[in-house]
């Protein structure tokens, strides 16, 4: 485990194991100040960090779930092929199960991965619409 991985919460450390994602040999982590993005095969899972800032509040599971649902609803309008679902994460932080059953311990926005080099093209398509 790298030094950076040791600083991650147990849930994120555990979700870096590729066996959580069928047919995946490796998982890449991208962090922002408000989320963790787990890139796994054809999919990306965005998990909100439990933070409260002047411009947003992700401090509780309920608020993070609501924000995930809002993100899906808003972004699906322009990118329905990318924004797929809000999925629950179940079991325990040390042994999580994606899209399992029971009471969720966390939520993630499930997205289809895309080639980042296509972003300028996607922006232009959007600008052509407005």
Language-model features: locations:
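Short, Lys/Arg-enriched N-terminal segments with co-localized hydrophobic residues
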Residues: 1-3
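Conserved ATP-binding subdomain of kinase catalytic cores across diverse folds
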Residues: 7-130
């Amino acid at each position: 485990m790298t030094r950076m991985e040791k600083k991650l919460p147990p849930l994120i450390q555990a979700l870096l194991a590729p066996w959580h994602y069928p047919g995946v040999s490796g998982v890449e982590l991208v962090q922002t100040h408000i989320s963790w993005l787990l890139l796994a095969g054809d999919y990306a899972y965005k998990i909100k960090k439990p933070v409260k800032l002047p411009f947003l509040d992700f401090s509780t599971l309920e608020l993070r779930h609501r924000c995930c649902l809002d993100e899906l609803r808003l972004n699906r309008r322009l990118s329905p092929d990318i924004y797929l679902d809000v999925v629950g994460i179940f079991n325990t932080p040390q042994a999580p199960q994606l899209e399992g059953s029971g009471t969720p311990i966390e939520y993630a926005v499930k997205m289809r991965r895309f080639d980042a080099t296509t972003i300028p093209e996607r922006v232009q398509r959007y600008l052509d619409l407005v």
